[in-house]
């Protein structure tokens, strides 16, 4: 099985991330155009619960398996067998709990009985996601990113196609059944992914002589302990974010219920933020994710050798590279919120939240890089503590603001932005304290200058120039023009020197 280098792996992740983001957005467009605002709101109410249950079912195996597989060729079969048993036990227990708790969650927490059937339908999906994560973890441990990228691509295609089929088939029976259909589509998408991974896995066995096999093997207690020793702490870290996300719609609907909003209106308001604005705002993160994954081994090695200047150089370049997509995306979100919403989702719901959130959300595009640096310098526990504290404060602030009639759903928006500022700022302060890295004030000023000039140019252009084309062509023309202006400004201000970029790529 062919391995990839770190740079090759990062490139594969970047390409796969881009394709998955595009397909994910296509899936979101399909959901919106077929389900409408009400359907998206209903789906977004159960989505955090679904993500929490998936986190619990996978129990940190996506992190534990690559780590253990990369360390040993002899025990790979035992690692896979033990992981499969752990995943199936967890998925079974969680599904049983879900069967008995779905009704109370729907009625008392989400305050919307329509969520009961969609919640129940999550059960089978947990088994598929767990098995898929095990197989993907195996290939990542073998440093082969192709199966993961291909299987994820196939999963997205199957999910989108079946979403359309199931929604068209079930929508006449009611909106609830159509939402259930989207979860069925996710399940069959995961099944398709598993089939691709299994075929690749079985093919790889033919080329191995001493590693993994399909023969039954005896397992001992230490095999499970080795896996759980890594997976449980990893689960704890992910649970913080998942549980915070799980509580989010519960707090929103309950606080708005106090103000007199019906469950349907609350779901629609929450869906506008979480189902329309946030997916668009998160689109550029696939680029920053690939960059953050690429710098981890380099910074980790530099930290072990005490080469702090090397860390500063790599971190500075990563932040500068992330500034390119982050900046132009922010400007476009601020200038064309209604056009983007109408073009993609055929609605203006969420456009005002997109425009308000974009300037502060800009910081999130650097948050992943800072978190990766903390992991590389063995300070992941501090990053987890930051996430925990900021999540708690976000929930407290959200609960307080949502109950103010004049603020209502904007309390969620303010709390999300507060969380981004606090987490990003805190992580930067930790890095500054640990390795002495400081962002140059001159670079910050030049960055804001580039953003400001691009935004003002776009605003003036919109006021004085009307293009005689379709909405799509107009948006593309404005975006290309502003993008070129932005890149020119970045080049003139030397925020991203070409010489340093070429040196970085050669390494």
List where the protein language model places each region.
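Alpha-helical transmembrane segments of multi-pass membrane transport and lipid-handling proteins
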Residues: 84-108, 312-363
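N-terminal membrane topogenesis motif
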Residues: 1-23, 218-241, 498-507
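Membrane-interface junctions at transmembrane-helix termini in multi-pass inner-membrane proteins
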Residues: 128-151, 359-389
């Amino acid at each position: 099985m062919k391995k990839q280098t770190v740079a090759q792996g990062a490139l594969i992740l970047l390409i796969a991330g881009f394709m998955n983001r595009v397909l994910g957005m296509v899936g979101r467009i399909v959901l919106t155009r077929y389900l409408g605002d009400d359907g998206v709101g209903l789906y977004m109410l159960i989505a955090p619960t679904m993500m929490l249950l998936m986190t619990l079912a996978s129990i940190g195996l996506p992190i534990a398996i690559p780590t253990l597989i990369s360390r040993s060729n002899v025990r790979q079969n035992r690692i896979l067998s033990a992981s499969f048993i752990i995943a199936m036990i967890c998925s079974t227990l969680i599904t049983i709990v879900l069967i008995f708790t779905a009704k109370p969650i729907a009625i008392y927490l989400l305050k919307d009985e329509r969520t009961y059937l969609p919640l129940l339908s999550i059960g089978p999906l947990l088994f598929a996601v767990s098995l898929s994560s095990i197989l993907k973890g195996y290939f990542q441990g073998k440093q082969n990113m192709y199966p993961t990228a291909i299987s994820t691509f196939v999963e997205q295609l199957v999910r989108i196609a079946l979403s359309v089929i199931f929604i068209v088939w079930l929508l006449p029976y009611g909106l609830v059944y159509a939402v259930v259909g989207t979860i069925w589509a996710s399940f069959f998408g995961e099944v398709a992914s598993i089939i691709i991974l299994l075929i690749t896995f079985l093919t790889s066995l033919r080329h191995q002589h001493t590693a993994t096999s399909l023969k039954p093997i005896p397992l001992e207690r230490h095999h499970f302990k080795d896996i759980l020793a890594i997976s449980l702490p990893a689960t704890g870290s992910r649970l913080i974010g998942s549980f915070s996300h799980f509580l989010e719609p519960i707090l929103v609907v309950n606080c708005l219920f106090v103000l007199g909003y019906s469950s349907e209106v609350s779901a629609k308001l929450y869906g506008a933020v979480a189902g329309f604005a946030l997916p668009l705002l998160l689109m550029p993160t696939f680029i920053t994710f690939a960059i953050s994954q690429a710098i981890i081994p380099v910074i980790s090695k530099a930290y072990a050798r005490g080469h702090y200047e090397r860390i500063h150089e790599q971190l500075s370049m990563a932040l500068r590279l992330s500034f390119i997509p982050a900046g132009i995306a922010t400007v476009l979100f601020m200038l064309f919120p209604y056009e983007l919403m109408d073009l993609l989702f055929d609605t203006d719901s969420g456009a005002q939240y997109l425009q308000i959130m974009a300037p502060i959300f800009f910081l999130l595009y650097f948050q992943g890089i800072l978190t990766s640096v903390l992991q590389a310098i063995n300070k992941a526990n501090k990053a987890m503590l930051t996430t925990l504290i900021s999540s708690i404060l976000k929930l407290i602030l959200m609960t307080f603001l949502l109950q103010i009639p004049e603020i209502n759903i904007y309390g969620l928006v303010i709390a999300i932005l507060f969380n981004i500022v606090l987490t990003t700022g805190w992580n930067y302060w930790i890095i500054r304290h640990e390795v002495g890295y400081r962002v140059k004030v001159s670079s910050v000023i030049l960055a804001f200058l580039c953003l400001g000039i691009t935004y003002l140019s776009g605003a003036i252009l919109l006021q004085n120039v009307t293009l005689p084309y379709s909405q799509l062509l107009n948006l593309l023309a404005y975006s290309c023009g502003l993008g070129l202006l932005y890149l020119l400004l970045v080049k003139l201000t030397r925020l991203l020197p070409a010489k340093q970029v070429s040196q970085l790529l050669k390494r």
